[in-house]
Amino acid sequence: MIRLRRAHLAFLVLCLAAPAAIGASCTCGDGDSQSETSGGAAGGGGGTGVGGEGGSLFGNDAGDAGCVDGEACGDGGICAGGVCCEAGQACGAACCGGVEVCSFQQCVVPGAVCIDATECPDGHYCEYALGEPSDGGVADAGCQGGASLATGKCLPKPPECAPGQEPGPNDPLTCLSKCEYMPPVGAFSPVLKYSWGDPAAPQTRDSVMMAPVIAQLDDDTCDGVVDERDIPEIIFMTFTGGAYNDNGTIHAISVVNGAFVEKWSANAGVTSPNHPGRSIAAGNIDGVPGNEIVVCTVDKRVRAYDAAGAQLWLSAPGSECFMPSIADLDQDGLPEVVVEGQILNGADGSQKVPAFDPPNTMNIVVSDMDGDGFLDIVTADKVYRADGTMIATTGLGGRYPAVGDLDKDGVPEIIASEYQNHKLFVWHLDPNAPNGVQIIRQDIDINGDLNPGLCPVGSAGAIRGGGPPTVADFNGDGFPDAALAGGVGYAVLDGTKLMDPATPDAETFLWIKQTQDCSSAATGSSVFDFEGDGIAEVVYGDEVTLHVYAGPDGADLFQTCNTNGTLFEYPLVADVDNDGQADIVVVSNSYSGFNCAGEKTSGVRVFGDANGNWVRTRRVWNQHGYHVTNVAEDGTIPAVEPPNYTQPKLNNFRQNVQPLGEFSAPDLVITLAPRCIGDYALMARVRNIGEAAVPAGVPVGFYAGDPGAGGIQLAGSPLVTTKVLYPAEAEDLLLELPDAPTGVKDGSVPIYAVVDDNAPPHTWHECREDNNKVMASGACTTPR
């Protein structure tokens, strides 16, 4: 059963003159829009709280004073504060004057003209009903959506209702109540949403065998900025003919009109060709607005591309480039690019710190390990300061690290795989211990009770094993756990038991599941809490199968064919189409002999929940060592990165999250009134009074009579919304009716508007759906 957190949801009351698209002023509409359950409009054109914004959208002249608040007065006015006020200016007990508008029972002066909420002060939104519609103006050069810009004016966001202070059905509306949709737990139904690539392409040229990144590269919304409101790009490398170590082609694809579109691709040619088997990273590295991508080359250089796919710079040859990380190590606002052995200036690729580590270190991550407020460089067995000086070493070796505070004592642990001997290490800094480290675990065999002989003799899976670890709370006990893949299995180890010296190594396993990765035995994984219940699920792909495992016991919640020669890549989770739902992004390739009963896959695929029940998540995953606090959703790299392991609801690694508002949902309401100047028309204003955005394309039906009781849909209906509606935002839809039925025009037949009409299938859920219909009169008063 769907779980809804149903509280009374108040809604925005905005009394204003007609928008420019309707006419500067008019005296039309002799009745207020009403909800069938509300009992009519409140004083001041306010509506009541269940069925819509209520109230006439258009004002009338004031009449005599000395009236009773909330009652009609004069010639179409409403009494407010003992004064007969124009209907459009009445605001509870006040009568707004001059340029003021009524917003949630408060008279406010609209702020500056805006095209987006980012142009408004904090705590404000862009009210498009107060601005001008799109007029064909030229958008910025980076605009990819092809739309011109509408404008609005900044207004204060409505306050959130205090607990127990929600307005009653007929009370004045002063705040918005919490709006959340709670997905059903246990209903896990992934479906394929988008795909790019053909397993039968010539020379298997659509093969991908590296973890993609998700970042914003262009202005899809045409608001003049590239930010989290745009549709992110998926960036990845392909290779041809099985040559996964040479001549990679980088691609940027994105969802446009419900399908993948390739924005650009680039091949560097024979001079320093891109390495298609190495990781990439994305973010704003040069201080200029917009994001860049950094990749490794075959000759161990680093190449940077701008957002349009043009080369920005190419570094000098280095000791190694394997998994680039982007971070602002010296907190000067200009990020660095950190690769195995050196640190580069993000702006131009020049060397900032010379070689400081042997090139056989195959992965680095960044995190503040000693609590001094500055990021450190972390390998499987060493920690360095940002200037390249070593803080400590275990001497154990190892390949892939992750960071998390397993016992939540404020001292972070390094969880590392030792690939050569399929071992797991756990250690942390301790200035009072030998070599400055305390080794907590060093001999855990990640194969557990699985036999390496499940892989062919001599294969990587039979001898070695251990991919990049993840850190997350898999069993819901409030403490993070560790997980990683090997050649024959995927293992989750209990973080509390790992930190307990009395627990034998073999008893630290929470669970282990047999898998098949004999070729590399080093694949990674990612983590996400799809149902928002506080328990993480594992997303993992081996040579033939994409799996989603339940965190507590490893139950296989989902599996599907996904052929992959494997290196150290992993599937990841992000919102790639900006629909407010998490998506799984997985890569595959067809060059090898791996198949599923003859079937192969290749390229990039995106899976989502069939019923739209996965919770919200971020629209970014910018590097292999992603850990949330390392990047903002718009790709900005923080000058001072807060430690992930100290942040509420985090303390994880390679797990995407929505730290705040993961259950936030939209809530659409609607008002309706006639247009009486010029040709007759009906205008519906659709407003989102929820806490999450709703995509464009929501149908709005117009009816003569109640559609639930045989009402007739009017000609030209339904219309659809044309823009994403973020919380508090509205859009006006105009239904031209030059030949409107007589009963509609004279008011003898009530008019109705329904938002999300007929509830077509979509992946978003409102926190309530009983406020989507509104009734009004279509009659016009005689102009004075």
Question: Predicted regions: what is each one?
Answer:
Residues 1-32:
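Sec-dependent N-terminal signal peptides
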Residues 21-84, 97, 102-104, 122, ...:
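Ser/Thr-rich, Pro/Gly/Ala-heavy low-complexity intrinsically disordered linkers and tails
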Residues 27-29, 85-86, 156-158, 606-612, ...:
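Short beta-strand-to-coil "C-cap" segments at the C-terminal boundary of structured domains/repeats
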Residues 64-66, 82-90, 106-115, 155-162, ...:
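Short domain-boundary/entry signatures in modular proteins, especially
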Residues 67-71, 87-96, 111-120, 160-171, ...:
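Disulfide-bonded cysteine-rich modules in secreted/extracellular proteins
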Residues 156-665:
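Extracytoplasmic/lumenal domain signature
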Residues 660-784:
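Extracellular/luminal regions of secreted and cell-surface proteins that mediate adhesion/ECM remodeling
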